[in-house]
Amino acid sequence: SISLTPAGELVLSYAEKILSLSDELDIRLSEMTGEMRGPLLVGASTTIAEFMLPKVLGEFNAMYPQVRARLIVANSESIENRVAEHTIDVGLIEAPAKQSGLSSHICCEDELRVICAPDYPLADMKSVTPKALEDYEFISREPGSGTREITDAYFRQHHVAPESLKTQMELGSPEALKGVVSTGLGFAIVSRAVVDKELQLGDLVSIPLKPPLTR
């Protein structure tokens, strides 16, 4: 085996420090010259991660090839908590941030719509009010979801208690919601972007809320 002398160990220790400082210097110089590099931890809610981020991350990677992006997927509440705890660099969520000390910016506006199976009683409606939805089976997102937070607030705003809805189950992803709704068990409320493929195939029907629900 090979072992270092005390002098060799001292030289190795300083060499490691020099290399570490060199890496840090590269990063700092890159920041000063506007060149981004290094790891980037991005947190995103389920809907955003599955249906909106893939194209954006591809474009980002092409613009900043020196940045190694890593995506963490969870519901909006969990992502917000991770940003507050500094375990991720940036979070993309569907509802306004609630914790103080966090800086938030609106990236885009999204419309939420009712979806149901083509043979479900709601399917032929041109639009539907929050009050009318009390008469139908509801497939909901789970607590902590940005979509759940927004829809609960929407119902309350229009004098419908979320607890009064005929909630059949609470599910943790848009894909799970679409799968259950397509069987005719009830309706769900999801981002318009989530159901493009199913609408084209005729597997689901999309109905605007009245008044519209945007976020």
Language model features with spans:
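Secondary-structure junction motif
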Residues: 122, 138-159
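Central regulatory/effector-binding core of bacterial HTH transcription factors
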Residues: 35-100
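Alpha-helical "hinge/linker" immediately C-terminal to small N-terminal DNA-binding modules
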Residues: 3-34
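Hydrophobic residues within well-ordered alpha-helices
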Residues: 5-8, 42, 83-84, 133, ...
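Short beta-strand and adjacent tight-turn residues that come in two discontinuous sequence segments
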Residues: 21, 74, 88-94, 172, ...
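Beta-alpha-beta core module
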Residues: 99-106, 110, 125, 132, ...
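A local structural motif
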Residues: 63-71, 159-168
